[in-house]
Regions:
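Long terminal segments
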Residues: 2-5, 13-37, 41-46, 52-54, ...
């Protein structure tokens, strides 16, 4: 019940003001909301989530961005910082742990590669529904 009340209090405060700061027991801002901007910090003061209009960043414990969304661009990184998924409008790439592209979708073209980088499937001019079916395993 206490959590629900705190959440309701936070929502009420956000609706009634443009700027909101939620602090931890040491007085450090943990959640910061200002207009369309939202920032949350971890116990070391590093920003974990960052939302600013169309931009969203989710960081790991080392401060590296794992998820990055900016408009139509989406990047998802692995623990080494290499982009695993990349989406930009019509282009989608998925990479393996060595950075090799496994799936590549660009407009109406689709390539699927094996672990050695050899092209297994190549479609050109296929319907979008086929692309979705092939990408989901």
């Amino acid at each position: 019940m206490k959590i629900n009340y705190l959440f309701f209090l936070l929502i009420t405060t956000i609706m009634s003001a443009q700027s909101v700061k939620l602090k931890d027991r040491y007085g450090n801002a943990v959640v910061y909301v200002d207009g369309l901007s939202l920032k949350t910090k971890d116990q070391y003061g590093k920003s974990m989530y960052y939302i600013d209009g169309q931009t969203i960043k989710l960081k790991d414990r080392y401060g590296e961005a794992l998820y990055f969304i900016d408009g139509n661009t989406i990047r998802i990184k692995d623990k080494y910082g290499a982009a695993v998924y990349y989406f930009d409008g019509q282009t989608i790439r998925q990479k393996d742990k060595y950075g090799q592209a496994l799936y590549f979708v660009d407009g109406q073209n689709l390539r699927v590669k094996d672990k050695y980088g050899a092209s297994l499937y190549y479609f050109e001019g296929i319907p979008e529904k086929w692309v979705i079916v092939c990408l989901i395993r």
